[in-house]
Amino acid sequence: YHLTTDLTDRAIEFIKDAKVIAPDKPFFMYFCPGATHAPHHAPQEWIEKYAGTFDMGYEQYRELVFDRQKQMNIFPAHAELTPLNPYTAEQSVDGKPWPPLDVVRPWDELSDEEKRLFARMAEVYAGFLSHTDHEIGRLLDFLEQSGQLENTIVVLVSDNGASAEGGPNGSVNESKFFN
């Protein structure tokens, strides 16, 4: 069982039902799969697609992604990658330096165990997001196959970028963070 698949199945059924009940009326559906919110989970085969992808470390990976985005003209060729921790030279809102646990530690300062853990967490996150993309695609495929895609407005909004799950020590136990 996976929630995102179930929500997609139910969304498709909702549209089918709406079109049976009132075929000429528009419908409104708010589809919220919750992807990349905790808990991070995805079918194993989606996670394994990313096995080893992040072993190089996050600094090197973000450089590769940024270069690819420039090649795709998402960013102009002259764009520069932002610093990993842009605020460390500034004071925190309380007037003090940024706390060490509020910044991303350089990959080469992590232990081998931390590197394995954080690389695996990135694999799970990526698998979760890719699986969600697949399920959104399945919903769009249904709209196309049922002849409704051309008469449907789809608005895709995300409130997530990176995830705070795992925190600076890798624990997904949120209570532990506050103790």
Regions found by a protein language model. Give the residues of each.
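Active-site-proximal cap/lid insertion segments
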Residues: 1-179
